[in-house]
Amino acid sequence: FEYDRLYDELVELENETGIHMSGSPTSKVGYETLSELPKENHEKPMLSLDKTKSVDTLAEFAGVHKCLLSWKLDGLTVVLTYNNGELVKAVTRGNGYVGEVITPNAKVFKNIPLTIPYKGELILRGEAIITYSDFNRINDSIIDDAEKYKNPRNLCSGSVRQLNNEITAKRNVCLLYPSPS
């Protein structure tokens, strides 16, 4: 009875807020297997930012640009597209001009809302990551040292690009996205 009460409360909260998370027990996400990941051109190129180790250069840049500073995230860049509040597409950065469509995989990321209370089109760019604790958990389950992943970024990249999104779901991929583009 307690589970049913909490489940009903969650349904009510999701309906009130318009937010339905991919990990919610109310989201009946079936797993999908693809034969290959389709490719798609980006509407706007997703080019790399210049790097600096100079505080002065960074201060000069920040003085003339609106910016957000964060720790370097070593993951995989992903673009999410919502139409009228529904997640309709997720594409990797790829070469900056052409990426791979990973929508079924993004729908099982640990923290991506499948629906949001927003009318119109909303495009978010973020970084898909796997935490060090999940990286260590997954590597610890692999017996052969030669088969272990070298770093969380390699594991994340392979997880995001899986043809079977059940594997993606088990790896706890998260997307960090600071602001709309």
Summary of predicted features, one role per range:
Residues 1-116, 136, 154:
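Phosphate/adenylate-binding "loop-and-lid" substructures adjacent to NTP/NAD/dNTP-binding pockets
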Residues 9-10, 137-141, 160-163, 167:
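Short active-site loop/helix that positions an aromatic residue
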Residues 33, 137-150:
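Short, hydrophobic/aliphatic alpha-helical segments
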Residues 73, 79-82, 148-153, 157-168:
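Nucleic-acid 5′ end/cap handling module spanning
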Residues 118-129:
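Long, non-coiled-coil amphipathic alpha-helical linker/lever segments
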Residues 133:
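Extended, highly charged clamp/arch subdomains and adjacent linkers
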Residues 166-176:
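Structural signature of FAD isoalloxazine-binding scaffolds in flavoprotein oxidoreductases
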Residues 177-181:
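Conserved small/polar residues in nucleotide/adenosyl-binding loops
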